[in-house]
Amino acid sequence: LDPFAGGSVRGIVAAKLNMPYVGNDLSEAQIRANKANAEEVLGISYPFFPQWTVGDSSQLEDVLSTNGISGDFDMIFSCPPYADLEVYSNDPRDISNMDYAQFIEAYKRIIKQSCSRLKNNRFAVFVVGDIRDKKGIYRNFVSHTIEAFTGCGLHYYNSLILVNQITSLAIRVRRQFNGTRKVGKVHQNVLVFCKGSVEETIDSFEELQVKKALEIFNKSRENSNLHDDVLVFYKGDPKNIKEDFGELHISDELPQ
């Protein structure tokens, strides 16, 4: 189940992995494009052809019922809108149009309805990243996502770091850092939650057939932490950062 379907990629990948997929999105045009893309990539008669629905995910139960989708799901996997970082439409139901407090309220409703359709002893996975407000302060969106799932009774079980391509950040980051002391961000957080009994969930999955690197994972379904989080806080008005710290000067002998 994917309550924030967006584009076609997750549905197509699920089909290639022989997994039934149901994704919902508010945009009818987006869903039409998804179906056309899936037909082009997979063919209309492909087994496990993705199923996309159109509707408001804050009314997800009604959307699923209207489309004749019953029963519970083996997994939730989604990548939600990052509040108003990108506004997708002028539809008042579009949560990217809402202020942050309204966004979080609607976001939690969507997560709650999604989790109600997740089977016991199964996983929910969200790919998220933190976002800044108009003053440049982080909103703590990752933590709000964790709160939304644990508020539904799920266990926060795994956290992974998805490293994105640097692309144009290498060009932009020097001016950005000198002007605001904001570091360039090139990762997202993959948050994994477990519904039900952790022990029974572990026992319900077959072992992955990769030897030493996965011995710990097969025992507990826990990922190994290969990173530390470096959290930076600033006391005062962020507008004064450049004045307080000046520009960062790099020697010509060092890479730019």
Located regions from the model:
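Class I S-adenosyl-L-methionine-dependent methyltransferase catalytic core
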Residues: 1-256
